[in-house]
């Protein structure tokens, strides 16, 4: 058993305090520190470097591969590919990942008699993907729909954003929030959710020891990338994002090299790529899937046979949650995408308006049951 620090707020005062709880399957392991610190896993620098998506070994070849991946993930590239994709191939993908709207009746039949628990990514799921990440606003109609959803089912936002940033967009106190790819988890404000009436609001931060390092790398990345027009470094508290959506494609290789040159000096951080964004995160066994598992346990559904989790997301980082649900054999994932992608999700939706439509239909169905 490993002890973990979990922060809870006092039911009467609302003051945040720290307590220690025993480790369970969802808590393994905590943030990895240098081997001199007791209670942490010792991993050699050489082995850790292998976990980076790009590193010093064979730099030129890996960098070219990285830039190719950057191009492949761009919506423009996907659109050009779609024009050449055969209709048969697209239809085959749709058969494997049918529209959640078209399959709504089947979904409801599977969920009947079970407790639906909803998990939602933010960017590209509740809000459109935009050039400026600070302007990724959700519509008022989407906010009203999510608010109604939270009245019917326990609802969580699971995002790469920091909690403060995503809360400034969503503005709903009755939700659970898992920011920084699940490394910063906070329950609803007490009194706002009927699902946590008798429980303190839980705040779990498995990568807390990495905060000084993340801040240090953030400052270096800001300095390193300031000469690249359009590049934007975002501090998501427990992880960092380097957005290149507004960077000229001719500068992508240069930007990738700059980012790599910083991250390579921190072997306990890993570098990966999302939708026109580099992600820098601590190398710990924690992701959106682990966050989903932790939230289910916090809600009392850890060993429950009649729970039905639904996770909706559009990014590579959401795949960990999709895979977890497949492994549990409970609920399913829904990928938000207009184009065929390799995914562990069971169903698909094309864009945020379709997500809102699906959520609205779930709310209507629940209200009819009551």
Swiss-Prot record:
Keywords: Hydrolase, Stress response
EC number: 3.1.3.12
Induction or repression: By cadmium in roots (at protein level).
GO biological process, any: response to cadmium ion
CDD domains on file: HAD_TPP
Named cofactor requirement(s): a divalent metal cation
A GO CC annotation given for this chain: nucleolus
Reactions catalysed according to its record: alpha,alpha-trehalose 6-phosphate + H2O = alpha,alpha-trehalose + phosphate
Enzyme class: hydrolase
Membership in a protein family: Belongs to the trehalose phosphatase family.
Official protein name in the record: Probable trehalose-phosphate phosphatase J
Organism: Arabidopsis thaliana (Mouse-ear cress)
Taxonomy of the source species: Eukaryota, Viridiplantae, Streptophyta, Embryophyta, Tracheophyta
